[in-house]
Amino acid sequence: IYTGEDTLSLHDALPISDFIWKNAEDLWGDFKHTDFGKIILPFTLLRRLECVLEPTRKEVCDSHAAHKASGIDIDLILRQATRYPFYNTSEYALGNLGSTKTRQNLQDYIAHFSDNARIIFEQFDFSNTVIRLDKAGVLFKICKNFAGVDLHPEVVSDRVMSNLYEHLIRRFGAEVNEGAEDFMTPRDVVHLATALLLDPDDALFESNPGLIRTLYDPTCGTGGFLTDAMNHVAEYSNRFKVPPVLVPHGQELEPETHAVCLTSMLLRTLESDPGRDLSKNIRLGSTLSNDQFANERFHYCLSNPPFGKKWEKDSDVVNTEHKEKKYDGRFGPGLPRINDGSMLFLLHLASKLELPENGGGRAAIVLSGSPLFNGGASSGESEIRRWLLENDLVEAIVALPTEIFFRTGIGTYLWILSNKKDGRREKRVQLINATGFWSSIKNEGNKRRSVDDDHRSQIVDIYAAAENSEVSRMIDYRSFGYRRIKVLRPLRMSLVIDDKGLAKLQDEKAWQKLSAEHQQIWLDALRQHMGNTHLFGWAEPFADETVRSALAAGKVIKAGKTFIKALTNAFGVRDPLGEPVLDADGAVVADPELTDYENVPLTEDIRDYLAREVLPHLPDAYIDESFCDEKDKKVGRVGYEINFNRFFYKYVPPRKLNDIDAELKQVESEIAALLAEVATE
């Protein structure tokens, strides 16, 4: 977990979490264990909002009383009174609800929040929760408990609240939120992604004091990426007279986590526009099938979409957009397999980058390894990579250490997208192998490692240098591409008329459709050639001759292409030394059993490759000229894959046989000595 100077670690949040979960003892027996989180979380958020409003409570109530009968819209007046974009006009608070009419008073208290704050509790179905607590006789006690803890942002920062929430999720897992693992991005990963995204624009921020830029996270969860990015630029005040301003936007699928993010944004203000309600830009819904920011673009994007999650629930809308809008929509390049929608978010972010003429856009997205290489040439995954690379949108990919996520130990990768690359990065992708940049921490779920401040700084410096080194490669994007060619070889086959062939003929559908009388005519003709070996082209003249002979005898039989194919299937025997089979036009017939494929680097001519790599071993091989790419119409289908091992592989020579032999003899001696001791006892 990131532990910057302005941030408490997750462990520092434990005293608060211990207090909150002491409330579970008051719930035990009346509520299921699985309900605890859904009860406690909204109370946590309520108390946090209450702590912020407490200093101006009397001023707001007095102002509301003075203006409510005037008929004017007093919303702006009350916001100015609180110095925040929300307010509450009730005289109640958690500490003065009373023990006799607690439920009615609490419901009245919630109802007097401004609309943008009240929606938070609606998403938790808080009204029903209050009724259940009241019936169980514990509502007053829970309210009193929370009234005694200070959750003001000056006491408990946004990061600690986010860490706290995620700690509680890990403690109760899916019982609190079935999609919990989808949004829990460790703070160290968030901070690294933010630094890589924003630091390249230092010069822009320095030359434009107070520059306003938009920020977007399509999978915003509790808002960790958004708040961290905003805090990151706020720290620029140490260097710049007026730091830049990021205006956050986000979308979240899960109502509960959306509510947490709403709370976080309600409590944040922009120095340039203190009354602005940042929570209005945090939307609820599925980003893939219900984009709440359609046709909008952003200067900066951050995202950690779920790993390996099916997108079948969104498939109808996504497929329709792909087919109807094509490249005018988000998913024009292609669609991945249904079992992993992470590449759809990659395309979604690319579509959200601000246009270069408006300052351009940059994005950072955390993905598993699958989007690097899943899918062969012409597959949806490969076509997505192709579009991103050929349009020069991929600036860098960072391989992160394993075991840095809470719910998985798999390898993860941080992609940096940009449509405003500087000259040294054009047409190139920087690969950074940061798998060794970590320090050990106390286990938190599957998380055993962290990218600390020093390691983060090293990675950012490596990225900024944009040079080749032991852990960095600047790669021409075409090096990731290949052209998959279909390699054919001639069919070399003789026709051997024997009992084995006759038995196989019985299984051919064309034979089975014949009448018994016609079958007998063909059998009589074939038996005249029993034991003979013929060229492959013999079948057609034989059939024609048999048809004529039957006709002369007053019998009408037919021998079309299907029947001749049945004869060659039944009696054909491959003959490596035979002549290639030719079709009616004199063209070589390919042997389907010898068909093979070769992936030829895009930077190489396919015929040169064939001559060097294939023909020395298979002199009769040739390229199928009809196997073409759908887009460029050239022979061979284009594919792209990004294989880190190819660029960072280190050869480790095997140990010398003498060393291995000596070690084995030593072990044998030790075993013999142990056995001798046992024998003497």
Question: What do these predicted regions represent?
Answer:
Residues 1-7:
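Short, exposed "boundary/linker" segments that immediately precede the start
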